[in-house]
From Swiss-Prot:
Gene3D superfamilies in UniProt: 3.30.1330.200
Top-level EC class as recorded in UniProt: hydrolase
Source organism: Pseudomonas savastanoi pv. phaseolicola (strain 1448A / Race 6) (Pseudomonas syringae pv. phaseolicola (strain 1448A / Race 6))
Gene giving rise to this polypeptide: cheD
Protein name: Probable chemoreceptor glutamine deamidase CheD
Cited SUPFAM superfamilies: CNF1/YfiH-like putative cysteine hydrolases
Amino acid sequence: MNTPVGVAEIVLGPGEVVFQTRPTRLRTLLGSCVAITFWHPWRRIGGMCHFMLPGRIRRHQPLDGRYADEAMEILIRHALANGTLPEEYQVKLFGGGEMFPAHRHDPHMQNVADSNVHAALALAEQHRLKLMAQDLGSTGHRNIIFDLWNGNVWVRHQPMEAIEKDAKQKNQRIAGR
């Protein structure tokens, strides 16, 4: 990952949306949340959102990046404000990992991860966006790194099975001391 000199790095938390017009590295950590990356290949500008929920009932409230539909609207407004069209962007989707797989079939628990995945895919289709890649679903968390100077997105996926195995091994080492 060759990084140009003087590149800014921004870490997005849940509910944040960032759009940059200069070389920037965007990072986030996802569980059941989903990140959408927007990259304009000619202008080398773009952004990323980290949404938590598919949507809400909105009544005269400002846009809120915690919700998929509103985060997408924020990204689209940034694209238009920079003299570009949303369909010119390369879009990638990440996340929606089930964090509580043992409760997956519990009728009393809403599956937020699945709802977020469906919302992201539906929004990409609804806005006729150029979906270039996706890494959605499964279990566990993902570390995302998005380089705006070249459009590369790096993903490190840690499934729950691996997390549980690592924790078990660590506990065994501690118990053996």
